[in-house]
Amino acid sequence: MREVISLNVGQAGCQIANSCWELYCLEHGIQPDGYLTEERKKEDPDHGFSTFFSETGQGKYVPRTIYADLEPNVVDEVRTGTYRSLFHPENLITGKEDASNNYARGHYTVGKEMIDQVLDKVRRMADSCSGLQGFLVFHSFGGGTGSGFGALLMERLSVDYGKKSKLEFCVYPAPQNATSVVEPYNSILTTHTTLEHSDCSFMVDNEAIYDICRRNLGIERPSYENLNRLIAQVVSSITASLRFDGSLNVDLNEFQTNLVPYPRIHFPLVAYSPVISADKASHEANSVQDITMSCFEPNNQMVKCDPRNGKYMATCLLYRGDVVPKETHAAVATLKTKRTIQFVDWCPTGFKIGICYQPPQQVPNGDLAKVNRAVCMLSNTTAISEAWSALDHKFDLMYSKRAFVHWYVGEGMEEGEFSEAREDLAALERDYEEVASDSLEEEGEEVEY
């Protein structure tokens, strides 16, 4: 089997994971105690979920996941919550003091004490897999544990499991509503560290998801649970083809092959459709054409940036539910006639399609309506560099006055790391600009190298 291990780091990572496992259990008919529901036992045994769950001798299913946080509060909620008997208690790892929003604490001082314990559990989990496919790492960019410990974990995974794919789901700091002052520092330091270790990073930003919840679901003041359930739908769509069968399956390595034209340019933009509230569901048609088109509207995208300002390099459309290949080809043909959707000229085809027949599931009494088909779009577009430039600008404002830098230096960081990380991100922005401007005339002049 092709197993996947999920690693959840820090508060954001652990809370997103809670919503994801809640949804996986519903999709596979697994109860909160890890045993199959009665209806599920009657059906044909489906081995798809062994990518995400391991089975014990008693017929209990245990998630292949590890929770790691430097402070115990969030993971304690898992230990006492509804799903407490689902997870293996040894795989819920917590420290005693948190990283206090400081990348250096998560990466150097506090994180160093915990990393070996986490890697030991990863090693045990990997040993029990027959064909480990790769890792999904969930963390935020802004927090101390998510940024610092997340980066440390990615570095160490590269050393121990060099060839395995590592996909990140990162919560990117929202442009307007920040949860901490030093978010720009943490984000840029962690991006610099993980840039060479991550194969593909799916970014979501809280502000964009707040807006989707407000606009499409009519929730006036969305909680983190509302946001995470929406993110869980996206993660579920991305991993559905690993867990269910479909006519066009996509595995972890295929994402990289189809979405990442150059190793550094690995930050696809995520969009999901349809997001409709239960009371509006009956009035929407939701044809394949409609949901495909709505993915290209900035309103349905999970990061605040405008794709109309950039060019698409590659796009992956993952359909699930009642969808046949013929309809998807028709939808893509229509997309290609739209003038607003511009592809770079060196990538003429640009669409990878995946279809999974399992319809999307919704959490009972949740915000999302039951729909019979959905699509998740992952697109590598040069517009996402807008997100970087906004963050770089904030970093520059603080760093020009060396504000808050002493907290990082006091935890054993060199001040040079800041400027090194900032230069790396400036280079990343330039990479995106070059890709966008690489028209064929310029190619002719640059043949020397």
From Swiss-Prot:
PROSITE patterns: TUBULIN. It comes from the Eukaryota. The record marks Y449 as: Involved in polymerization. Pfam families: Tubulin, Tubulin_C. Disulfide bonds: none annotated. The active site is at E254. InterPro entries: Alpha_tubulin, Tub_FtsZ_C, Tubulin, Tubulin/FtsZ-like_C, Tubulin/FtsZ_2-layer-sand-dom, Tubulin/FtsZ_GTPase_sf, Tubulin_C, Tubulin_CS. Gene3D superfamilies: Helix hairpin bin, Tubulin/FtsZ, C-terminal domain, Tubulin/FtsZ, GTPase domain. Belongs to the tubulin family. Tubulin is the major constituent of microtubules, a cylinder consisting of laterally associated linear protofilaments composed of alpha- and beta-tubulin heterodimers. Microtubules grow by the addition of GTP-tubulin dimers to the microtubule end, where a stabilizing cap forms. Below the cap, tubulin dimers are in GDP-bound state, owing to GTPase activity of alpha-tubulin. This is Tubulin alpha-1 chain. It comes from Emericella nidulans (strain FGSC A4 / ATCC 38163 / CBS 112.46 / NRRL 194 / M139) (Aspergillus nidulans). The gene is tubA.
